[in-house]
Design a protein with these regions (language model features):
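An N-terminal assembly and electron-transfer interface module characteristic of large anaerobic redox
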Residues: 1-167
């Protein structure tokens, strides 16, 4: 098989109506696109973008055509979902905007690397702020994992691709 999959083609087609002639770039807006569902408000990416003073838009938040068109105003398009990468990268090239692919992960070092990439690409000052924030988030995650382990004990858990696209 060569070329994009049907899923990738669909995700690309979803953003083809965004027109660079109608959309004025807002360098303080990031559109997170390409996923099946919106990211939770408490996710790391949304928290970091809020700290850095960015407005975040997602397709799932749009209830009108005008809101959909505003997705194209972003100075940066961010994709976290493997199937969305092709379409969102194509959109960013067509509109001549920045593109970031930061696939969701469960590995602390990969997460740290991606969050540093995001922080640096936005030109945000204060690496110490980011470092302290990441350490706090890791501690909270470990606390939540320990709590879950107390509840489920040694019961086997299986998570497949319908929940998350990456191992």
């Amino acid at each position: 098989k060569h070329g994009p999959t049907p899923d990738q083609k669909l995700r690309k087609a979803m953003y083809e109506p965004l027109n660079p002639d109608r959309n004025k770039m807002d360098t303080k807006q990031i559109s997170i696109l390409g996923s099946d569902f919106a990211l939770d408000l408490s996710c790391d990416l949304k928290e970091l973008l809020a700290i850095a003073g960015y407005k975040v838009r997602e397709l799932q938040d749009c209830s009108t055509w005008e809101e959909y068109e505003e997705l194209g105003n972003a100075g940066t398009f961010l994709c976290c979902y493997p199937s969305g990468k092709y379409g969102i990268e194509t959109l960013a090239e067509r509109l001549r905007r920045a593109f970031l692919y930061l696939p969701l992960s469960f590995d602390y070092e990969e997460i740290r690397s991606e969050e540093e990439t995001l922080w640096n690409s936005l030109g945000v000052e204060g690496k110490q702020i980011l470092s302290e924030w990441m350490e706090k988030k890791i501690a909270l995650c470990e606390e939540a994992l320990n709590h879950a382990k107390q509840i489920i004990g040694n019961a086997p858990i299986t998570i497949d691709y319908t929940f998350h696209p990456r191992p």
